[in-house]
Amino acid sequence: MGKAKSAAAREDVSMPTAPGVLPGSPVVTLPVDLTINGDQCSFAGTSETDYCTFSYKGEVSAGAMELALSEVKLKNAKLAGMTWKLKPYNQEVEEQDPVRLVWESEKGIPLSGSFEMPVESVLKIALRTPLIAVGAENKVSATDMLGTVLKDVTFMEDGNIVATYKDAANGGTEWTKSPVNLAQYVVENDNQIKVFLNPAAIIAAVNNAGRAVDIQTVIQQAIQMLYPMLVNGVPVAFEQTEDALSVYLNTELLLPLLKTLVFPLLSDEEVVAMLVELMKKDPDFGEMAGLAEPMLKAFPEIIESTTKVEIGLNFVK
């Protein structure tokens, strides 16, 4: 499955522990019997972690160690070896949607006077409204666009998650496979998996934040909340039938994140004004700015009154 070379332990704790080669185990201890041949030692065997079994083989020489892992297999193979295609989108049929979105809250989106629309309804309308320019005259919705960039997802027997996608943002036109060890998974039970992400990609995204006022505080809070998930895995709920799969982040995960990260940002009038101005200047989303402003201003209260929120993707065989 992969190779690893030893390195001195780092004192820099700013970078979270990587997912590791074995899913669910950022650190693995191997009791080995060394075979000595001159200035080199070798070892081989089989072992297991809480989540998988595997074989290993390695060599040790002065100042270096090389370890190769193979035959990695998850103990819980409920999803192993399955490829799921993104659910086709049909604008005329509400159930025929690749996006799973549930949002229940007492507070709605103010539209006119005292009339409020449920936040779930507004978000679904926004996702289905053709706002994204494709070519000179054509526009598509975010939901439509999703189907053009993501084809399917495979849960491999060794715990890797591999997606078939198009890198449309960089002009990609051909379907390609994501690399292994970018995302891994283990099955916790019949309704939950844990997903282990590459922390370097997440840290890079966080470091791209451009505004200084209060952003650093939010980033620090985000890292404090997300760090355990990077090490221990992101809990992801799923519902599986014979021919369908829904994978989503549930209320237990999302609501604390919304209250800690999104609430303080959207309580800042300067941030809201900045977001609205950005939308007004964007040729694709400018026409939504009028709807977005009251929605953004209402969001702190919406978050406070939220009782259920689920966001994810729907797949079919």
Q: PLM features: what roles do these ranges have?
A:
Residues G2-K57, K124-E270:
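Contiguous, well-ordered beta-strand patches that form the walls/edges
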Residues M1-A133, L275-F299, S305-K317:
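Acidic/polar, low-complexity intrinsically disordered N-terminal segments immediately downstream
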Residues K139-A142, K297-E301:
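Short, P/G- and charge-enriched loop/turn segments at secondary-structure junctions
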